[in-house]
Amino acid sequence: MAKRGGKRTVGVPYRFHVTPGIFMNSLVPVADNSGAKLVRVIGVVGHYSKTVHRRIPGAGVGDMVVVVVKEGKPELRRQIFRGIVVRQRRPYRRPDGTWVAFEDNAVVIVTPEGDPKGSEIHGPVAMEATLRWPTIANLASIVV
């Protein structure tokens, strides 16, 4: 029997299927003013990679990832945070049939509950991320 329900997540319980575009050990720029400039992805929240041997966890737009700051303010460097993927270069298909691809990858640093650490987001934000994380939608200036 398949397991049903019971697992609580942060954000909305559903998500659109988005082709993963950011994987473990990816260096990704930060799209907010939290003080971090470049982060390395060290985990994907909710991804269970022990079911298939040697499968590398991947994250798409709207997924929460675990990151470590590589460049930025000295007090933030080498610290572990959570982040939300708001842009990815890899094209993904929306339910209406359109294909979306951004010119860069980007994450927004958040608390474990999903609240952004910064007060503004630079550049466009994918619609899938704003639907799943309403607090990010409040800070986004451009939603694509």
Curated annotation (Swiss-Prot):
GO BP, one annotated term: translation
UniProt keyword list: Ribonucleoprotein, Ribosomal protein, RNA-binding, rRNA-binding
PROSITE patterns: RIBOSOMAL_L14 (PS00049)
SMART domains noted in UniProt: Ribosomal_L14 (SM01374)
InterPro entries: Ribosomal_uL14, Ribosomal_uL14_arc, Ribosomal_uL14_CS, Ribosomal_uL14_sf
Any single Gene Ontology cellular-component annotation: cytosolic large ribosomal subunit
Extent of the signal sequence: none
Domain of life, source organism: Archaea
GO terms, molecular function: large ribosomal subunit rRNA binding; structural constituent of ribosome
Family: Belongs to the universal ribosomal protein uL14 family.
Function: Binds to 23S rRNA. Forms part of two intersubunit bridges in the 70S ribosome.
Subunit organization: Part of the 50S ribosomal subunit. Forms a cluster with proteins L3 and L24e, part of which may contact the 16S rRNA in 2 intersubunit bridges.
Protein's name in the database: Large ribosomal subunit protein uL14
Gene that this sequence comes from: rpl14
